[in-house]
């Protein structure tokens, strides 16, 4: 796989180009109504656009990132913009995606954390799918190539969380698998050593043997220094990314064991990681989930559950997505269309992580309603 410089792709931008871009982005965010184009005929497409419009309150066009949140969170915020682009095909959304890319391409979207890199790779693959612009796919290839450097023989394989090599855990490995199989789907090549497919299958073989998948079909956070399951929290996002990756492995190979494992994890998640009303929750929500990471997690799960549903059409998943989206909009929203941490409500506070996470529930239902004969009123959860 050939590494290319993203900076070289953007060097031709002149100073006038950059000024023009800032003017366009400022105009888009400040003055243009975001619900201005034809969208699917359902409320949740409109709700998604309204919620993403609120998300842009924190967008900084000078940096191409969202204020008051982290680097990896901004990748997921951008996936919220991509969700509205998929629904509305509005060029205003595409302008934000382009601005974020142009403002940050010089460092190839690399940093000291392999999971952060994976989020950006996933985001640029999605941008490629929506726009057809090869530079986004090239960005994902560059990121993936760097991620391969995180694999070594400690614990018989797997990626480290960071380049300091102190912790092997679930999320960088799930993202590595997801990005590998999606690059395989979008590029020519065989499955030989060093190929994207090779990495995807190697990663999955290692992951399922690592012990991080526990006896309840849930993924714990990571491994001890002795390469054992550390028993840490079964965060929702660790259950989510693996669903999308396994769904794509099934699509590529036709091997039903991938789909069966994805469904086992999904079934365990939607029956366990919920409150008394069947709404997705994190274990820390009773004390506010301090920090900027956890508020991002639930949207990642829903995004990948929706992708799994698009493959297997299991009714329980659609009902769960519908219940989540309804609860977010009805119980976890203020009068500015800002969305909070607790999807069951009440609204607590607003920030880009909370907002972009909840956007994923709205967008998932809106997107599925385009292709599914779906009642937008969820069934009562079964206890």
Model-assigned labels for residue ranges:
Residues 1-19:
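N-terminal secretory signal peptides that target proteins for export/translocation
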Residues 91, 130-135, 189-195, 256:
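Short coil/turn and helix-start
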Residues 88, 131, 180-183, 187-190, ...:
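Long alpha-helical scaffolds in large eukaryotic adaptor/regulatory proteins
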Residues 95-186, 198-201:
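Extended ligand-binding groove/face enriched in aromatic
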Residues 21-33:
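Cleavable N-terminal signal peptides of Sec/SRP-targeted secreted and luminal proteins
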Residues 39-121, 127-130, 136, 168, ...:
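CBM-like carbohydrate-recognition segments
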């Amino acid at each position: 796989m050939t590494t290319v410089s993203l900076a070289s792709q953007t060097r031709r931008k002149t100073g006038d180009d950059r000024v023009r871009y800032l003017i366009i982005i400022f105009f888009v965010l400040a003055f243009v109504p975001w619900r201005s184009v034809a969208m699917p005929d359902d409320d949740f497409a409109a709700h998604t656009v309204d919620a993403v419009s609120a998300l842009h309150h924190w967008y900084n066009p000078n940096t191409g990132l969202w204020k008051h949140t982290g680097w990896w969170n901004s990748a997921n915020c951008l996936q919220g913009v991509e969700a509205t682009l998929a629904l509305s095909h509005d060029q205003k959304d595409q302008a934000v995606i382009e601005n974020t890319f142009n403002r940050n391409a010089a460092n190839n979207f690399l940093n000291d954390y392999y999971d952060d890199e994976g989020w950006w790779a996933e985001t640029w693959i999605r941008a490629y799918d929506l726009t057809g612009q090869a530079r986004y796919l090239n960005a994902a290839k560059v990121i993936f190539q760097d991620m391969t450097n995180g694999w070594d023989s400690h614990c018989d394989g797997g990626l480290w969380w960071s380049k300091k090599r102190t912790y092997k855990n679930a999320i960088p490995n799930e993202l590595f698998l997801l990005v590998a199989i999606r690059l395989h789907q979008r590029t020519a090549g065989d499955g030989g050593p060093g190929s994207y497919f090779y990495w995807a299958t190697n990663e999955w073989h290692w992951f399922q043997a690592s012990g991080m998948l526990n006896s309840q079909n849930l993924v714990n956070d990571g491994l001890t220094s002795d390469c054992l399951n550390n028993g840490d929290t079964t965060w929702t996002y660790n259950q989510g990314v693996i669903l999308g990756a396994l769904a794509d492995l099934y699509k590529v190979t036709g091997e039903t064991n991938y789909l069966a494992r994805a469904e086992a994890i999904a079934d365990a998640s939607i029956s366990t990681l919920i409150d008394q009303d069947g709404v997705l929750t994190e274990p820390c929500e009773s004390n506010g989930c301090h920090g900027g990471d956890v508020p991002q997690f639930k949207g990642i799960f829903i995004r990948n559950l929706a992708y799994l549903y698009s493959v297997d059409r299991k009714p329980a998943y659609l009902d769960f997505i519908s219940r989540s989206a309804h609860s977010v909009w009805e119980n976890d929203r203020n009068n500015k269309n800002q969305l909070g941490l607790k999807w069951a409500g009440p609204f607590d506070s607003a920030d880009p992580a909370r907002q972009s996470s909840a956007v994923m529930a709205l967008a998932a239902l809106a997107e599925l309603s385009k292709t599914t004969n779906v009642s937008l009123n969820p069934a009562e959860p079964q206890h």
